[in-house]
Amino acid sequence: RAAQVIAARLKSTDATVTRRGRSLGFSGGVTRHEKDLLGERQIPDAALYGVQTLRALENFPITGVSLRDFPELIIALAQVKEAAALSNTQLGLLDQKLGDVIVRACHEIEAGRHHEHFLVDMVQGGAGTSSNMNANEVIANRALELLGEPRGTYAVVSPNDHVNQSQSTND
C-alpha cells in the first residue's frame, strides 16, 4: 500500500510549480542560469537555493513535507556551517572575508530568516545530501548578496568549496 501511495505522489507531483499548495517560486519571472555536472538550469532569481536543490525537488518529491517545516533542523544545519566556517577561518583554510560573510549568513538563518528557501523533501535519497546542499546553496547565495554579488556567482562563494569546506557532502 505504501508503495502505491508513493508511486501516485511521484506521478502527480510537479515539483516545479507547487507542493501542498505552496509555491516553490517557479511561477515565472526573472531567472538566473546555474550549471552543474548534469548541465545548465534556470533558477528563479529571487531564490537563495541553487541547481542542486532544484534537482532534489525534481528527483525526490516524495512526501510533500519540506525542510522548511522543521525550523529547528534548519537552525542546526546553519550552526554546523557556522562552526565549520569559523574553524576553517581560524586554521587559515578559508579567507577571513569569506568566513565572516558565511558566518553572517548563518546568523541570519539561525535568527529565523530565509527558511522559506529550504525546500527539499524530508524523505530523499542520498543520506541527507540534498538537505546539506540546500543549506550550502542558501548560505552561499546569501553570503554573495551580503558581498554585493549576484546569486549564483559561485566562483566568489561556493556552496561546495567554501560553505561545505572540511565536511563531507552529507554531513
Residue spans of the language-model regions?
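Conserved, well-structured ligand/cofactor-binding cores
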Residues: 24-170
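Low-complexity intrinsically disordered segments
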Residues: 13-15, 28
